């Protein structure tokens, strides 16, 4: 009770000395600095356990439910694989995760690799966008660069994010966290012998130096992101490895999320998806891999194997239509003329009315480049249209013939193709170009040549009239050409996009024009999907017959197969010209 009797001055309190062993009331009271550090420690532990809450409460970024789950799994597993459909914001989510990891775990070294350096740089660009909307993130970042050769993010706490090219030149880097975006596009040898070697010593915070915390060592992490691909590819085996390890309870996580979740969360427009699926050149195989997060495996009866074709995707620069070269103002981007001895073909599979299954016209340009054994076949251009009038198609063939300086036309002259042949045998007036074309005639079939009433018409058309024996030979020759590497085809769309980005002016083009450039690469992907869908049936005499699944097409296959067959005919003629006559007495001297 407080009263004057109990009141004591400080002087009288210590009149009998100070007991230094007596603890005062504030003995356990911590300083402001100590309380601050305790609070930081508590919140850090909480946010490390709940990284999705850190994104919302500290960074001020709102996540969808599936994104919360993915962020959580990224932080709490050593190995993570995310197979995403288009439209889920995979790159954006990766950039958010990188910021979370870098802030909550000071001193973290993050390396991002991809099929191309440009793709990896997109993560840095997304972080640049994020910091503009998040004041706390902006305060955490010390330096950020998005330049091609030095893209990086440095944080005040010592963490950093850098990008590397997926090649042998990336050796000697060091990291605690490796992220490989579009990992299916990276060579497995590069991942195993170069990129994974970055992960040497794990993050070593100072508290590990204390004996009571020495057991809390951290592990390095690996994160792989992509869409699904073909089962014959190494990435599928990697997926199976991750799945089996996850099911055994190891610190592995793998998931595939289809396009429906992007629609549900408002990230993808439902009507847009319907429109794409209703397009006449809709590719169900590509759709299942890219949008449904499903791996595709060719059937046991498939005549063409994916790996035999894919290994020949080596042409970075196809031949674009000549007028495209004026759209990019770069002196290094120019049309490639013929080489000495080169022959060019435009090979065609003709369709009739639009709207029918298995019914599309395909025009393919071949470059036959001489080598010591004959010709290398380069498929440099392909376009497809769904049906059309015979006169219109004949005019388009003549346009391509002129544009690419072709020497021969290869044409299936059965059924609808016969009408196109007859149109080519007549003078053609091109209204679009205000030009008249001279008539052409057949070079390899006298009966077909007789249909041309112009005696002086140049003989440049190779007529193809399929039958069981010829169709079998054509299929065998095409399969052999791909297996032996005699046929070269353009690289995939993603690699093609990165190739085009090298040229000044490409980035400034409209999306529609960019799409026209990329179609030269996309057509080859559609060709591959057609070919690996073809199943073989063998007759008693050993002939092969190829059958496409119901409602599927093989127009691109036919166009390419016809062109390759005539290339073989020309190659045999070339080799015959160079052979010695065994009866020539000069041979013996």
From Swiss-Prot:
It holds the Pfam family Terminase_6N. Signal peptide: none annotated. Gene3D superfamilies: 3.30.420.240, P-loop containing nucleotide triphosphate hydrolases. InterPro entries: P-loop_NTPase. This is SPbeta prophage-derived uncharacterized protein YonF. It comes from Bacillus subtilis (strain 168).
């Amino acid at each position: 009770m407080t009263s004057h009797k109990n009141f004591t001055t400080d002087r009288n309190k210590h009149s009998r000395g100070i007991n230094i062993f007596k603890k005062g009331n504030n003995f356990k009271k911590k300083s402001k600095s100590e309380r601050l550090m305790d609070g930081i420690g508590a919140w850090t532990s909480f946010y490390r356990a709940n990284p999705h809450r850190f994104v919302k409460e500290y960074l001020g970024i709102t996540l969808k439910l599936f994104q919360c789950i993915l962020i959580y799994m990224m932080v709490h597993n050593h190995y993570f694989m995310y197979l995403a459909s288009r439209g889920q914001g995979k790159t954006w989510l990766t950039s958010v995760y990188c910021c979370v990891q870098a802030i909550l775990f000071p001193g973290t070294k993050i390396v991002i690799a991809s099929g191309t350096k440009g793709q990896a740089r997109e993560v840095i660009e997304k972080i640049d966008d994020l910091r503009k909307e998040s004041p706390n993130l902006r305060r955490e970042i010390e330096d950020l660069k998005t330049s091609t050769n030095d893209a990086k993010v440095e944080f005040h706490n010592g963490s950093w994010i850098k990008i590397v090219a997926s090649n042998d030149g990336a050796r000697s880097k060091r990291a605690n966290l490796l992220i490989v975006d579009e990992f299916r596009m990276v060579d497995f040898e590069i991942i195993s012998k170069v990129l994974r070697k970055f992960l040497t010593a794990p993050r070593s915070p100072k508290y590990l130096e204390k004996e009571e915390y020495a057991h809390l060592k951290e592990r390095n992490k690996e994160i792989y992101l992509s869409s699904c691909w073909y089962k014959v590819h190494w990435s599928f085996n990697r997926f199976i490895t991750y799945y089996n390890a996850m099911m055994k309870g190891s610190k592995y996580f793998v998931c595939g999320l289809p396009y429906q979740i992007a629609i549900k969360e408002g990230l993808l427009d439902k009507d847009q998806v319907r429109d794409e699926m209703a397009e006449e050149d809709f590719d169900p195989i590509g759709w299942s891999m890219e949008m449904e997060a499903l791996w595709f495996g060719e059937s046991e009866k498939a005549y063409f194997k994916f790996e035999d074709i894919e290994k020949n995707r080596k042409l970075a620069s196809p031949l674009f239509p000549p007028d495209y070269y004026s759209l990019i103002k770069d002196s290094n981007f120019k049309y490639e003329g013929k080489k000495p001895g080169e022959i060019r073909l435009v090979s065609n599979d003709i369709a009739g009315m639009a709207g029918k299954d298995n019914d599309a016209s395909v025009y393919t340009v071949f470059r036959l480049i001489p080598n010591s054994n004959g010709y290398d076949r380069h498929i440099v251009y392909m376009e497809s249209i769904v049906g059309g009038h015979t006169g219109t198609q004949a005019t388009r063939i003549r346009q391509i013939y002129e544009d690419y300086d072709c020497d021969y036309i290869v044409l299936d002259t059965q059924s609808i193709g016969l009408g196109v042949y007859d149109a080519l045998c007549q003078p053609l007036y091109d209204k679009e170009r205000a030009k008249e074309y001279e008539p052409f005639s057949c070079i390899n079939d006298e009966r077909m040549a007789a249909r041309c009433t112009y005696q002086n018409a140049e003989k440049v058309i190779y007529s193809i009239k399929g039958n069981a024996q010829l169709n079998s030979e054509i299929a065998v020759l095409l399969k052999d050409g791909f297996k032996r590497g005699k046929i070269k085809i353009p690289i995939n769309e993603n690699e093609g996009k990165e190739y085009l980005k090298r040229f000044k002016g490409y980035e400034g083009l409209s999306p529609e024009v960019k799409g026209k450039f990329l179609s030269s690469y996309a057509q080859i992907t559609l060709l591959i999907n057609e070919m690996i869908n073809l199943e073989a049936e063998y007759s008693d005499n050993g002939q092969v017959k190829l059958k496409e699944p119901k409602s599927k097409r093989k127009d691109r296959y036919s166009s390419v197969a016809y062109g390759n067959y005539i290339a073989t005919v020309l190659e045999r003629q070339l080799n015959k010209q160079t052979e010695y006559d065994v009866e020539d007495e000069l041979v013996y001297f």
